[in-house]
Amino acid sequence: MNAYIDTSALAKCYIREPRSLEVLDWAEGHGETATAALTLVEFRCLLARRRRAGDIDATLERMALAEFDNHVRSGSWRIHHGSFGDFATARDLIDTLPNHPLRAIDALHLAAARSCGATHFATADKTQAEAAAALGFTVHRFY
């Protein structure tokens, strides 16, 4: 079974939030799980945004980032580097799913999941979940 996790769900593995334990259990149960290379930047941005908002402190920010980086280096997350074709696919998804208000990063995650052959898609974003379901993914919702 090929699984993909977007940044909204992946973040729950590093920051205690509602449904965090469920995401961890899901990830452990799916073995090799892919995420897009853009998650490296998006997750870093998420941590900084949460620190600035006062949701986490600088220590937790550093610890979460270090743990994530260790997981990336060890292969716990399979980073899908993609290609120009993923950007073209993401662009096309805006037209393919006209009733889903996809943001650019949402479309890129969906394109990456398709490109790496995922059949399962984990997200904590309702709009993303609906779009993934419309594309035929088995969606695992963590919101």
Each model region followed by its residue ranges:
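Short, well-structured N-terminal submotif of metal-dependent ribonuclease cores
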Residues: M1-V41, L46, R50-M63, L135-T138
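Short glycine-enriched loop/turn motifs at secondary-structure junctions
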Residues: W26-E28, V72-S74, S115-C116
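A generic local structural motif
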Residues: R19-L21, A66, A107-L110
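Residues at the C-termini of beta-strands that transition into short coil/loop
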Residues: A37, H81-S83, Y143
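Active-site-proximal, substrate-binding regions of enzyme catalytic domains
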Residues: R44-L93, A134
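Active-site neighborhoods of divalent-metal-dependent phosphate/nucleic-acid chemistry enzymes
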Residues: W77-K126, E130
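Histidine- and aromatic-rich ligand-binding microenvironments
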Residues: A3-D6, L102-R103, D125, F137-Y143
